C-alpha cells in the first residue's frame, strides 16, 4: 500500500466493551495523490447483525465484498471462524497482506 494511493478504512461501534458492528474497507484513491482525493472501495468486510441488510460474522463467518468502479462484482468466502471482537483486526491484517493483489484485480481502472 502506498500513502495517498490506498488505505484501510475501519469504522466500528462498541458498547459495554463488545463490538456491535464494524466495517473494514480497502480503498483506492482515484483523485489527486497530494490534493483532492477521491476514495473508492475495492473490498469490504462488515458485521451488522441487527440490520436487515447486514450479517453476523459469528454465525455466517467473514466474507469479502469485492467492488470495481462502485459495483459489487464478487464475494470471497472461506475464511476461518473469528469472533466479532477479533474480526476487525483480522480484516486489517488480511488487507495489508493482500492489498497488492486486491488492488490490481479489483481497483478502479485507468481510463
Residue ranges and their predicted role:
Residues 2, 11, 15, 33, ...:
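Intrinsically disordered, low-complexity segments enriched in small/polar residues
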Residues 59-110:
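Acidic, low-complexity intrinsically disordered segments
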Residues 16-17, 34, 48, 62, ...:
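Alpha-helical structural elements
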Residues 25-66:
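Acidic, aromatic-enriched beta-alpha/helix-loop junctions
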Residues 1-41:
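Negatively charged, low-complexity tracts enriched in Asp/Glu with abundant Ser/Thr
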Amino acid at each position: 500500500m502506498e500513502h495517498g494511493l490506498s488505505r484501510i478504512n475501519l469504522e466500528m461501534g462498541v458498547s459495554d466493551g463488545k463490538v456491535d458492528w464494524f466495517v473494514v474497507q480497502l480503498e483506492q484513491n482515484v483523485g489527486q495523490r497530494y490534493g483532492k482525493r477521491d476514495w473508492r472501495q475495492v473490498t469490504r468486510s462488515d458485521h451488522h447483525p441487527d440490520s436487515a441488510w447486514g450479517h453476523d460474522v459469528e454465525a455466517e463467518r467473514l466474507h469479502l465484498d469485492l467492488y470495481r468502479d462502485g459495483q459489487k462484482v464478487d464475494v470471497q468466502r472461506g475464511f476461518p471462524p473469528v469472533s466479532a471482537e477479533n474480526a476487525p483486526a483480522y480484516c486489517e491484517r488480511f488487507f495489508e497482506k493482500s492489498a497488492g493483489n486486491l488492488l490490481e484485480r479489483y481497483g478502479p481502472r485507468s481510463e
